[in-house]
Amino acid sequence: MASSSDLADILAVRGLVAGYGGRPVASGIGMTLKPGDILGLLGANGSGKSTLLKAITGQIRLEGGSVTIDGVDLAGAPERAKVGFGLAIDPPDLPAALTGRQYLQLVASIRGCVEDDWPGVDIAGRLGLRRWIERPIAEYSLGTRAKIAIAAALLGAPPLLIFDESLNGLDPLAAFEVKRIIRALALSGRHAASISTHVVEAVPGLCTRAVLLADGRIARDWDARQLAEANRTPGAFEADVMRALEAQAAEA
C-alpha cells in the first residue's frame, strides 16, 4: 500500500505570487495537498488568505509561480483545472433570480454532472435545503445561501474542495453535517480540502494540517501529529497561533 508521500498531489502551489494592480499581496507561497488532507487556512484580515484562494481558483492572474489542480496546470489549461475543484465562499455571491434547483443545475452543467450528483449522500436533505430548493435564492437567508453554495461545491465530488469562511454562517446542525461529509471524503482517499476560517479552535478537531498566513507569506504550519497533540489540550492551539502572530508582528 502506498504511503501518503507517494500519492499524487491534488493541489500543488509552487512559488505563488499574486496581487492587484502589480502590487503583490501573496508572495512566495508553496504548499501541496494530497488525498486525505484537510488543510486549515488561518490568518488575520489582510493576511493574504482570500488573495491566495482567488489565485488558486483562477479568479485573479498569477504574477509568479504555478498552481496545479489534480495534475492540470491552472495557467496552461484553466477550464480543465477548474473542473477539479468545488468552491464555496462567504458571503456567497449567487444569482438571486434563480431558484436553488436552477443554480445547482447551472453548476452541474459546468461540471459535467447532474444536479444531485453528490458523493454518496443526499446533501440537500442533510442540510435542510429541500423546502427551499424551488424558491428564488433572493428569498434565502445568509445561512441558507451558504448551504446552497456548499451543496453546489460538492456536486460531482471534485478532488479538491475549497471553503472560504463558508462554514461560519451555518447553524450548528448544518456545520456538523458538512464537517462529517468533509471527513468522509478525505478518508475515502480521493479528495482533499482547504478550509479558510477565523474559528481557530475548530481547526485541530477537523484538519490534518494547518497553515498560518501573515503579510502574504506562510508564517507557521502544523502537521497532523502537532494538531492531534494540540487537540488534547483545550486552548493549546489557539495559544500557539497567537504566539506565531505576535512573533510575526514583532519582526514587522
Report the location of each language-model feature.
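The feature captures the beta-strand-to-loop junction immediately N-terminal to the Walker
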Residues: 42-44
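Conserved ABC transporter NBD signature motif
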Residues: 65-73, 81, 222
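Helix-to-loop junction immediately C-terminal to a conserved catalytic motif
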Residues: 57
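Catalytic Walker B motif of ABC-type/P-loop ATPase nucleotide-binding domains
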Residues: 161-165
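Conserved ABC ATPase "signature" region
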Residues: 105, 109, 115-132
